[in-house]
Amino acid sequence: MKGYDRKMEYIVDAEEMRRADENTIQYFGMPQLVLMERAALAARDAILRKWPEIFSGSVRILVAAGNGNNGGDGAALARLFFLAGHDVTVLVSGQEAKYSSAMKKQMEILKKYGDDHTGRKDEFADGGNRYKGHGLSVPADSGQKVKAGGNLRILTDEEWKAKTGGNLRILTDEEREAEAGQNLQTLTDERRTSETGKSAGDYDLAVDALFGIGLSREVSGIYREKIAWLNQLSGKKAALDIPSGISAQDGSVLGCAFRADLTITFGFWKRGMLLYPGREFCGERKVADIGITAESFQGEYPAGITLDKKSEVTGELLLSRSPDSHKGSFGKVLLFAGSAGTPGAALLAGEAVLRSGAGMLQIVSPAENREIMITRLPEAMYQVLAEDTDWEKLLGWCDAVVIGPGIGQGRLAEQSMEKILTHMSEMERQKPVVLDADGLNLAASSGRLSGLIKAYTAMGGIVIMTPHMAELARLLHCGMQELQSARLKNMERFVRESGVVLVGKDAATVVGYADKGVFRYYINQTGNSGMATAGSGDVLSGIMGAMAALTAVKLHRKAGKEKEAAVREAYFRTAYRAVYLHGLAGDKAAEKSGEISMKAGDLIGALPELLGECTDQRRTAGVQRYFFGDAGNGN
């Protein structure tokens, strides 16, 4: 991946984050305690913005701190809340001798403030907003008398175990759901009501700062007990960096894991918080800037990137439209889709092509589908699929071809796909091919077809495959369990062997390709469960086809000036932006129809509004460039 695209947000694994952290401290000279303080401030602000309603008075807060630097972040956060007048309990872990140097220092600071908070000016006694000056909309204290420092308690492992004693109940997820709404009390010897009116064993907020991203083995012993206990508390829950028990590498649950309502991660997205099941444990996800920047990678950028739901997608999503343009200026798509009597997939994919900005569409489908195609999609041209279909002529006409939605796996479908790939390899100008659905199944079952695909990519041709997990398992000739246990590694192996751009569709869709021998990937953050419906993949193949055609036109205008690596990267960007747009369409459709009632056509219905918003963003970016230059616009 060339340089640093400021539209993108990097995804790091534990080692990449460790390297960035180390370079920030050692090379740039940023003190570790400064980074920790910024992390605590960022976490505090994110929590206040998430739950302003619970901070209208004195709040009871629990911070579970480990003995490493994640625990140090937690101790610093505990201090900030304590000095704001809240009652804070810090549950520390292990022996002090095993604390990291930063954690030890943070605990020393915290204890000194705890010992010295009496006798100071009661700056909040008038009930004013204790966070005034931080730009935070937090309710005032409603006249409640709160001293400048709240109550601070530090609990060791032994003290915590003594308080939970033999009455600690560890609930399963099902049991916890069954008891939802009940006030779970596990500190059984502290059930008396405190002067704030809350049970002394209950907390308004619990913060997980036990492990962070360094965890690589299963959680056991007292840590497992702590996480289970934390999960049973009834208040709000926040995690620092990543929920404890979630692998930062692959999102797997290492024995057990903290279930957060909000996760504030520092510097960059952690891979494990974007992949399932880890993503489910994070709740709302936020990245906080604490001073570790992309410059800290020293030119060795991470392999992973993402776009969050607030990112701009205008750069390569839309092709600028000149007033004197014509319909051929914005990409011509050839769609081989549908089988006899089953035109649904072809209609969905075809309409998605046109709604995504392509100038022209030609559909090749069996004769039985002709009447409904012409009636339902009159804007498209139609060609009857037959033994003698002139694929060479059709391929010469288009800028991109989509193969697969609903074509079946019969002899004619397989022969047609073979002819397409053969003709594509013989053409002077290679064109992008999008393979979906039955096109993928045919490729998985035919050595001849898979060989043609490899030959085409070897000569510089672009093939974008869009399998869901079952289709990907067939392509890899492995079982689902084997695929899911090492999803990224399996995807990497496949793209290295085949040379394709691979879109692994799932709840967290991953797009990957090989860049000069290095596996690069994108993890998508848009979309919702309502998109798990028939035809959603056909819509994606249509969006992908339209955007591939637009990219082909854009690259063709450069008259071959782009090198092969740059071309492949351009289509990687095309693929992940199509996935991003597809997910955004799903999110917008869910706002109108709800996730339960959504159907694939709702995604298409959302595209005009979304692309209109992109056009507005592009105009705004153009004005900014005119007045201020390219600063801050990425590419």
Predicted regions, residues:
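Internal gly/pro-rich beta-alpha loop/helix module
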Residues: 205, 210-301
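Short, conserved catalytic or adaptor-binding loops enriched in Gly and charged residues
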Residues: 107-113, 143-147, 160-163, 256-257, ...
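Small-residue (G/A/S/T)-rich helix-start motifs and N-terminal tracts that mark the onset
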Residues: 2-104, 128, 203, 262, ...
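Intrinsically disordered, low-complexity terminal tails and inter-domain linkers enriched
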Residues: 115-199, 423-430, 449-455, 515-520, ...
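Nucleotide and nucleotide-moiety/phosphate-recognizing core
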Residues: 45-124, 131, 137-139, 152-157, ...
